[in-house]
Curated annotation (Swiss-Prot):
Subcellular location: Cell membrane
UniProtKB keywords: Cell membrane, Membrane
Membrane topology term: Peripheral membrane protein
HAMAP family associated with the record: UPF0161_YidD
Name of the protein: Putative membrane protein insertion efficiency factor
NCBIfam families: membrane protein insertion efficiency factor YidD (TIGR00278)
Function: Could be involved in insertion of integral membrane proteins into the membrane.
InterPro entries registered for this protein in UniProt: Membr_insert_effic_factor_YidD (IPR002696)
KW Cell membrane (keyword) present: yes
């Protein structure tokens, strides 16, 4: 599924985006963000992040730097919740 979604974005980049004026208000561009989000977070969450980003790409939003959030390490969360009891 990831390959299909990324392939669709790459088709957009190659056959549509390059022939239209640059209008993305963000860096990285929304299409580059979408690819990175899907690669980092998978098809479902990555698509959600990409759609959320695209919905902000309009003239009434200031835009700017907006990077894909890093993937949370599930092991890091569980390490904090484990308590070790020392018996004396």
């Amino acid at each position: 599924m990831k390959k299909i979604l990324i392939g669709g974005i790459r088709l957009y980049q190659k056959y549509i985006s390059r022939f239209t004026p640059a209008t993305c208000r963000f860096y990285p561009t929304c299409s580059a963000y979408g690819i990175e989000a899907i690669q980092t977070h998978g098809a479902l969450k990555g698509s959600y992040l990409a759609i959320r980003r695209i919905s902000k790409c309009h003239p009434f939003h200031k835009g700017g730097l907006d990077f894909v959030p890093p993937k949370k390490d599930k092991n890091a969360d569980s390490e904090h919740s484990c308590k070790v009891h020392h018996h004396h």
